[in-house]
From Swiss-Prot:
Pathway noted in the entry: Glycan metabolism; pectin degradation; 2-dehydro-3-deoxy-D-gluconate from pectin: step 2/5
Transmembrane segments: none
Catalytic activity, as annotated: Eliminative cleavage of (1->4)-alpha-D-galacturonan to give oligosaccharides with 4-deoxy-alpha-D-galact-4-enuronosyl groups at their non-reducing ends
A Pfam family hit: Pectate_lyase_4
Binding residues for Ca(2+): 182, 225
Species this chain originates from: Dickeya dadantii (strain 3937) (Erwinia chrysanthemi (strain 3937))
Cofactor annotation: Ca(2+)
InterPro entries: Pec_lyase, Pectin_lyas_fold, Pectin_lyase_fold/virulence, PEL
Role played: Involved in maceration and soft-rotting of plant tissue. Pectate lyases have been implicated as pathogenicity factors which induce maceration or rotting of plant tissue. PelE is sufficient to induce these effects under laboratory conditions.
Active site: 278
Cofactor note: Binds 1 Ca(2+) ion per subunit.
Name this protein carries in UniProt: Pectate lyase E
């Protein structure tokens, strides 16, 4: 067996005499054959697959190593949804490295027919102690979600993930059409590193939406959700593009009993390109965002820029040396137009150090939102470089999949 590929192994059960030579015996074999999908071990194609998170909240409390300790029998190369599922092996939490060597259609090429069908087939659960890494620029996922739920120690690297399209959005009177399904979900999970990942609406951008009941027929939800007490997460060197409501940290104002003291997330060296809002919006959590680049346009026909940092109930955010390039900014509530990069949703704690807006320094701490300064100690080592246009260009060119 070629150990660089996934395979299906037929386990045959026979009784009595040999099946050879008689049609009846052959029929008996076929009737009792069980097709079992198993994953074949593969060689390690990149040493990057064994790296651990090196900075940010994902380094704390034991760190995030994913499948770095995988035995040779738990290293896989996959390029189809059947191979991917076989490598994941359900809830198996033994360390594993899954190298994605092709574009994986999570639907298996079979269109979803209803909400229930999409729920059953599109949500792919990732077990503990797993690294999923794309090889070169080949690692892609479409038509589904990677769900990291109720587990620990997961790494997603060098992947392109197209945000799923809800085939059956629900309509709410007064709120219009609302979609389910996020590209990546981190739910009730600790220690996750997302690095060099691109998440995009891809083939169905929002300007292609149709209209139903006189309302825009919205079919996208979020790019990344981090919720229900998840903790110790780093998102780095990634690219979020062509999306509206992008990253949500903390899903409800009423979930403080589970979220308070958790939802600690670091964003660094990421590019947010033509996204509308929520980069991120945070409730209860503590977010550190440094050396990120935000590019938007208030007049964009599909992804109208609204804000970058949304400070929600009991949420806090420290911004350091970020670069915002936002076209057609406007004053909001009498404040300088630069203040529109931050929005207060009942949150009280926000500070910025050294960020630039459209190439110039600006004091975001003086916008008059009534925020208290972010005073919590950052426990990990990091280097927030002084942001310049040159550095912003470098961060942008290095962000996303295919750049590892």
């Amino acid at each position: 067996m070629n150990n660089s590929r996934m395979s299906s192994v037929s386990t045959q059960k026979t009784t009595g005499r040999s099946a050879l030579g008689t049609k009846s015996a052959l029929a008996a074999i076929i009737a009792t054959t069980m097709m079992v999908s198993v994953a074949s071990a593969a060689s390690l194609q990149t040493t990057k697959a064994t790296e651990a998170a090196s900075t940010g909240w994902a380094t704390q409390s034991g760190g995030t190593t994913g499948g770095a300790k995988a035995s040779s029998s738990k290293i896989y190369a996959v390029k189809s949804i059947s191979e991917f599922k076989a490598a994941l092996n359900g809830t198996d939490s033994s360390p594993k490295i899954i190298q994605v060597t092709g574009a994986i259609d999570i639907s298996g090429g079979k269109a979803y027919t209803s909400f229930d069908d999409q729920k059953a087939r599109s949500q792919i659960s990732i077990p503990s102690n797993t690294t999923i890494i794309g090889i070169g620029n080949k690692g892609k996922f479409t038509n589904g979600s990677l769900v990291v739920k109720g587990v620990s120690n997961v790494i997603l690297r060098n992947l392109y993930i197209e945000t799923p399209v809800d085939v059956a959005p629900h309509y709410e009177e007064g709120d219009g059409w609302n979609a389910e399904w996020d590209a990546v979900v981190i739910d009730s999970t600790d220690h996750v590193w997302v690095d060099h990942v691109t998440i995009s609406d891809g083939s169905l951008t929002d300007d292609k939406y149709t209209t139903k009941n006189g309302e825009k027929y919205v079919q996208h939800d979020g790019s990344l959700d981090i919720k229900r007490g998840s903790d110790y997460v780093t998102v780095s060197n990634s690219r979020f593009e062509l999306h509206d409501k992008t990253i949500l940290i903390g899903h409800s104002d009423n979930n403080g009993s589970q979220d308070a003291g958790k939802l600690r997330v670091t964003f660094h060296n990421n590019l947010f390109d033509r996204v509308g809002e929520r980069t991120p919006r945070v409730r209860f959590g503590s977010v550190h965002a440094y050396n990120n680049v935000y590019v938007g346009d208030v007049n964009h026909k599909a992804y109208r820029y609204q804000y970058s940092f949304g400070i929600g109930t009991s949420g806090s955010l420290l911004s350091e040396s970020n670069a915002f390039t936002i076209d057609n900014m406007k004053k909001i509530s009498g404040r300088d137009k630069e203040c529109s990069v931050v929005k207060a949703f009942n949150g009280k704690i926000f500070s910025d150090k050294g960020s630039i807006i459209n190439g110039a320094s600006y004091n975001l701490n003086g916008c008059g939102f009534g925020f208290s300064a972010y005073s919590a100690k950052i426990p990990y080592k990091y280097s927030a470089q002084t942001i310049t246009t040159s550095l912003a260009n470098s961060i942008s060119s290095n962000a996303g999949y295919g750049k590892l």
